[in-house]
Amino acid sequence: MLTIITPCCRPANLQQLFNSINFTHVNRWLIVHDTTHTNGVFKGVFNHPKITEFGVSGGISGNPQRNKALDQVKSGLVYFLDDDNIIHPNFWEIVPRLNIGYFYTFDQQRWDEFVGKPGDIFKGDTPRLQKIDTAQYIVPFYMCGTWKEDDYKADGLFIEDIYNKNKVSHIYIPEVACYYNYLRRPTK
């Protein structure tokens, strides 16, 4: 089963994330609110049996929040869903094909000019720093390390470490199965 981890500093976006999740394939969705600027206080958004919400202060880019959520996971596959994104519909087509013995990467639909022109595809075939985005991988919990809490590039370092330790367990799925910052894309 799949555990989704969302570090959250934009609670207004959570309903859109919720609407993109197929809970049939999800064991738990862990939402970790960044309470750095709220004196440790947060207001939970959902009352759902598969959703757990809690708060953590400090760090950058949601990294301490991801680590705290990983403390709650014991097994299964893990997917990191940022609070400025939603899950791509194709994601739910690949999830039933996944095996706990491997970590997976896939392609991403971009809205910026990072890979060329807006709308181009960012390949997920290179799980290395600055070659992949957080939304482009699913990993078994037992392969997970911790996120560097004070490093903006922690997502790339996290997956690169997994890749370096488990190269023979990497499967690249050459399909678009995620977006890049979908909720921040330009709209016309």
Regions found by a protein language model. Give the residues of each.
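Short beta-strand-to-loop acidic/aromatic patch adjacent to the donor-nucleotide binding site
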Residues: 75-86
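Short, well-formed alpha-helical segments that are part of the catalytic scaffolds
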Residues: 10-23
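Conserved catalytic core of nucleotide-sugar-dependent glycosyltransferases
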Residues: 88-153
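Active-site donor/metal-binding and catalytic loop motifs
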Residues: 110-114, 135-136, 173-188
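Short beta-strand/loop segment that forms part of the nucleotide-sugar
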Residues: 26-38, 52-57
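A short, conserved alpha-helix in the catalytic core of glycosyltransferases
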Residues: 152-168, 173-174
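Hydrophobic targeting segments
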Residues: 2-6, 21, 27-31
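Glycine-rich, basic loop-to-helix element that forms the pyrophosphate-binding segment
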Residues: 57-72
